Amino acid sequence: MTIHLRLKTRDWDFWTPILLNDIHSENLDLELIRVQSLPDNFAQENDCDAAEMSLSRYAMRRNTGDDQNIVGIPFFIMRGFRNRCILTLQDSPLKTIEDLKGKRIGLSGWQDSGNTWTRALLLEAGVPMESIQWTLSRMTDSDPIDFERGDGFVDNRLVFQDPQETPLVDLLKEHKIDAIFQAFMPAHYYDKDFGLRQLQPDFVSQEKKWFNRWGFVPGIHLLAMKEDYVNKHPEAPSLLVHHLRASQLMWLAKRRKYFETTPWLIESLIEMAKSLPTDWDPIGFEANRKMLDEFARQQYLQKLTSVQRDADFLFPYKGI
C-alpha cells in the first residue's frame, strides 16, 4: 500500500532528485510543498502532514507543553556551523569572539536555533551575554517589518527592539552596532563593495576546531510530523526519512561529479571530505543525543527555558 504524504519545506537543492523523480518508493508518494518561511505551527494547517521546523521553536513548544499533534523526528534538514554567521564591517578591528565582549550586536530573532548556537560560541569563549547590548530588527530593507519579533525577550535593559525596525545592515554601516548575527547572508553580501565580512577571517578553520571539540554539526531545522498522521501510518517516519536521505546522498554524488557548477566547489567538497567524517549528518535519536543535550542546555543557560531539559525530553519518539 502506498501512502501519500505532504511535506512543507524550503527549496533546498538536495531535494532536486525527488522533484525530478530520480528517487522512487513503492510505499511512499511524497508531495513537496515549497515555502519561503517556515510555518509557526504546521500542526494547525490542513494542507500538510509534515514540515521542516525550527529546532528552537520545537523545543520551546515541548518545554511549555504547546506541542499538540507534533512529533519531532531526529532528522535534521538544516545543520550549520555558526562562526560564519557573525558579520562585521570590512574595516572593523574586531576579529575574534572574545572581541565581542561589551559590544553591540544586532539580530533578527532572539529565540532562533541558529542564534542560540551562535550565542553558545560567546559563552564558550567566556563572553557573558549580559556584557552585550542586543538590538532586534530586520536584516535589510527588503525584509518584512515585525515589531513583535522580540516579544517575551525584550527587556529594554540588555535586549532592545529597534523602534523603527531599521535594517541591521544600515545600523552596522552607521556604526550604531558592532556586529550582526545572521543565518543567511543579506542580499548583495557577495558584491565586492558591500563592506561586510565574517568576524573571524579564519572562520572555516575555527569551525573545524569547534567540530573537533564538540563532535557534531549544530542542528538548526528538524523534520516534524503530525501525530495523528503517524498514528494512522506508523511506518511513515521511517519511509520519509530514508526517502529524504536518499535524495540528499544522490545530490551529493552529483555535486561531486558536476563540480563545475561554481568555480571552486571542488575545493569545498575536498575540504569537507578531509575534515569531517562521512556521518557528519547522522539520522536517529542516539546519533544526535549529544547535540540535543547541548542545545537543551544552551536554551536553559540563555533563559529561553526555565527548566533544563535533555534529549530524551525533547524527542520522546524513538522510532528512528
What is the predicted role of each segment?
Residues 288-320:
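Tryptophan-rich aromatic "cage" segments
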Residues 6, 13-125, 134-143:
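Short, glycine-/small- and polar/acidic-enriched structural segments
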Residues 31-42, 95, 132-170, 269-272, ...:
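Short helix-initiation/N-cap motifs at beta->coil->alpha
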Residues 145-256:
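Pocket-lining segment of extracytoplasmic ligand-binding domains
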Residues 21-22, 46, 175, 194, ...:
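Short glycine-centered helix-capping/turn motifs at secondary-structure transition points
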Residues 91-97, 127-129, 228-236:
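Short helix-loop capping/hinge motifs at secondary-structure junctions, enriched
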Residues 117, 121-124, 171, 291-301:
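Amphipathic alpha-helical segments that form well-ordered structural scaffolds
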Residues 224, 229-301:
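Secondary-structure end/capping motifs
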